[in-house]
């Protein structure tokens, strides 16, 4: 399994992402469904920001919108077959989790990562959804946005590809969510939930048996 999970944006050492994902000639995609509750113009700008940042690293990418695959899991499987790296940007973890479920991407990513068929990369919400559970993140993200947008309740289970909760923006001065993240950590400690904190600039790198913070 290959993962590059940053606290915020590309992190301070994106060369690790390039080493992990670059060079195999396959395309990269940006998944921005954590921004699906944002106004269309804001969402579009957020996609362009990620595409430009990846292009600066030599990783040309295009958006893959999971909403286009709601109820079409097999078509998504076919389209992901040619993808070498998926970059899942931050935003609302509950919105992203819902889109992963409706499209079938949650199980597909599990299968593809187990087969070492792609790199899963991203930051903030894009990393948090890999946790065993999203409980506690309602202190940071608006879980009710799922109901307002889709008329369905939010999902609370994560993809459980990580053995502990991923906690970004921890004690990261200047980030607007760092105070709320402190409350998340306090809850996890009180409830005995295993977690891993990352400061902005850091990333969790998983490359087969190797796991480290970069």
Predicted feature descriptions by range:
Residues 1-94, 189-214:
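Extended, subdomain-level signal for the structured scaffold at the beginning of enzyme domains
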Residues 64-68, 93-99, 125-136, 153, ...:
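Short flexible/disordered coil segments
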Residues 157-201:
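Conserved anion/nucleotide-ligand pocket segment
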Residues 14-16, 40-41, 97-99, 130-133, ...:
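Short glycine-/acidic-enriched loop or helix-start segments at secondary-structure transitions
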Residues 83-90, 112-126, 176-187:
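A short, terminal or domain-edge coil/loop segment
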Residues 98-172:
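Class I SAM-dependent methyltransferase SAM-binding "motif I" and its flanking Rossmann-like core
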């Amino acid at each position: 399994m290959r993962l590059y999970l940053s606290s915020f944006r590309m992190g301070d050492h994106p060369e690790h992402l390039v080493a992990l994902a670059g060079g195999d000639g396959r395309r990269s995609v940006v998944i921005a469904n954590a921004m699906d509750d944002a106004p269309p113009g804001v969402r579009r700008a957020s996609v362009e920001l990620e595409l430009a940042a990846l292009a600066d690293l030599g990783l040309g990418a295009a958006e893959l919108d999971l909403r286009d695959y709601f109820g079409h899991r097999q078509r998504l499987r076919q389209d992901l077959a040619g993808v070498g790296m998926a970059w899942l940007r931050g935003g609302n973890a509950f919105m992203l989790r819902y889109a992963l479920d409706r499209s079938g991407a949650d199980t597909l990513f599990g299968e593809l990562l187990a087969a070492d068929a792609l790199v899963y990369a991203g930051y903030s919400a894009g990393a948090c959804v890999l946790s065993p559970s999203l409980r506690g993140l309602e202190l940071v993200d608006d879980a009710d946005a799922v109901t307002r947008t889709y008329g369905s309740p939010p999902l609370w289970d994560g993809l459980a590809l990580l053995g502990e909760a991923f906690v970004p923006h921890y004690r990261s001065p200047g980030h607007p969510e760092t105070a709320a993240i402190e409350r998340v950590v306090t809850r996890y400690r009180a409830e005995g939930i295993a977690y891993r904190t990352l400061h902005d600039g850091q990333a969790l790198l998983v490359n087969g048996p190797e796991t480290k913070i970069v």
